[in-house]
Each structure stands twice: as C-alpha cells, then as structure tokens.
C-alpha cells in the first residue's frame, strides 16, 4: 500500500477542514471557481453574523440569499431536481469542494449536471471523491 500518498491526501483534507472552519468563523473567504452570484454575499454575511453571535441577523441574510436564487434545477446521477441544497444551512445551495489545498464554494446554480460514484471507502462518506473529467 502507498501510505505516503494516503498521508498526503489526508493531510490536505485536514488542512482544508481548518480552512473551512476559518471560513465559517468569517476569518477567511472560501475560494470560487467562477465569479459568485450576488446572493453569495448574503450567505457570507450570515456566516459573519453567526461568528459574532448575531443569530437573528444571520437568519435575515440567509433568508435574503435563498429568496434571491432564481434557478437551481439540474440532474444528479441521471435524476432531475428542481431545487438542491446542502443539509448544512450555513452553505445552503452551495457545493463545498476541496481541491489542490483550497476550500471552494461552487453554487449549485453554476452546475448543470453532476455524477458521483458510490462510496468505496469509509472516508467517502465524509469526503466525496471526484470523478475523472471523462466521467463528467
């Protein structure tokens, strides 16, 4: 087994979890692949309010963000959906990615279609591995 490679992968995942935590504390912004839609500002403002203990103000920003989203329909593994959102209300309709040592937000509204393999390892239930580009 190639434990050196596994150690590198887990090291990157742990570093990105620290980056993610800093983003939720409003200490660091997540990265974006494309310019984010305007409603992302309200999600980020909600994180900042939560970090300051201002839960009601955070809810106002989060609600404003959700109301501003116009289209989030698409396909995942061949099935269609009209709306998709993370179960973590802090990120809502954003896919969290860890790639190349970066913590990235990719709004579902910027994705047309997704495919994801079934989990093969226990860690796949925590961190979903990407498919190769030829499988997209």
Where in the sequence are the language-model features?
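Alpha-helical protein-protein interaction scaffolds
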Residues: 1-52, 57
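Long, positively charged binding patches that form subdomain-scale interaction surfaces
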Residues: 50, 55-136
């Amino acid at each position: 087994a190639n434990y050196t490679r596994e150690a590198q992968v887990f090291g990157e995942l742990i570093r990105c979890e620290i980056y993610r935590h800093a983003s939720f504390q409003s200490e660091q912004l997540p990265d974006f692949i494309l310019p984010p839609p305007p409603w992302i500002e309200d999600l980020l403002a909600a994180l900042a309010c939560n970090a300051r203990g201002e839960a009601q103000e955070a809810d106002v920003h989060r609600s404003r963000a959700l109301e501003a989203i116009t289209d989030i329909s698409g396909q995942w593994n061949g099935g269609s959906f009209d709306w998709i959102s993370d179960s973590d209300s802090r990120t809502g309709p954003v896919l969290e990615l860890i790639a190349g040592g970066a913590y990235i937000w990719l709004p579902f509204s910027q994705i047309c279609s997704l495919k994801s393999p079934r989990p093969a390892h226990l860690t796949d239930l925590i961190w979903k591995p990407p498919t190769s580009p030829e499988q997209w």
